[in-house]
Amino acid sequence: VTDTAPRPTLEAVAARAGVSRATVSRVVNGGDGVRDVLVERVRKAVEELGYVPNQAARSLVTRRHDAVAVVVAEPETRVFADPFFALQLRGISKELTAHDNQLVLLLTEGRDDHARVGRYLAGGHVDGALVFSLHLDDPLPELIQRAGVPTVFGGRPGWSGDRRDVVYVDSDNRGGARDAVRHLVGLGRTRIAHLTGALDQTSAVDRLDGYRDVMVDADPRLIVEADFTPAGGERAMRQLLDRCPDVDAVFAANDLTASGALRVLREAGRRVPDDVAVIGFDDMLPVAEQTDPPLTTVRQDIEEMGRLMARLLLRDLDRGTSHEGVAGTPAGVVLPTTLVRRASA
């Protein structure tokens, strides 16, 4: 059954509250200059009548859509298979919801998708954008800059040159990697390998650099490129065992890569951690707790990264300034990491 009752109007709210239509409009749209007693009367009338502001009309007044685009530079097959994205999206969604903003999810896989997203952002449909999982050759930053949309990036941007206008939230990938490798060294391991992430992403590059900070003279054959996926971890681990059968420890670029490596080690009859110690990165639950054995890993607060990205963007939108213009606030925010010890190392 369809409810055909007319929606309450601005005029009806004004009549109920005993104020002018202009006063109701200012209160509903967050304007200043209305006495507290009148604000309370308007809010009471809105609640009693069930009045819902017309978003299109409200946007004309506030120049805000109360919508934020979340752009993930990955195909949907990876986004919906990797818990990392779910955790980051959950953090973003919680923060946006708390401020009555809508999340508009945009995924990009190829050139056509990039052009589509660029047109959408330039079309004025959203107030700002949150962008993560960028690749070094990604055209999205240029498209976003052209669109003139306030943006916060997830992860350290990989562009060359001084871009002080870039706002980003990241984890201490390099420091976390150093902690992981130092732990393996402390266990007495000497043939410590690294299964990297996709090296066109700064998180993978930073973790590789952290490994190299500790393993200065490491055999280059101990570094094998993977792609942050379980299948990539399996391929890289098989390649590593062929190259360096004497490997006694593995630092994997993320937990999914580590889970693939653990499967291959088990198939090869290598005991973990007796024969080969394994450490991951992320501490994604339940993945890290359900591997066999449970995974020692570097914890980054993925959900908090998402919340902080959204918080920075909303704060800048409220102030009507770029993040760079906010005194005392750095353009890049780097969150700490922690080594979580379980049975694998």
Q: PLM features: what roles do these ranges have?
A:
Residues 1-5, 67-71, 75-182:
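Alpha-helical recognition/docking segments in bacterial nutrient-uptake
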Residues 1-66:
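N-terminal helix-turn-helix DNA-binding module of bacterial transcription factors
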Residues 23, 63-77, 183, 192-197:
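Short beta-strand segments enriched in small/hydrophobic residues
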Residues 49, 187-188, 240-246:
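Glycine-rich phosphate-binding loop signature in dinucleotide/nucleotide-binding domains
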Residues 74-87, 105-114, 169-179, 195-238, ...:
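Hinge/beta->alpha junction and helix N-cap segments in small-molecule ligand-binding domains
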Residues 126-132, 193-195, 223, 244-254, ...:
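Periplasmic-binding protein-like
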Residues 243-345:
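Flexible loop/turn connectors
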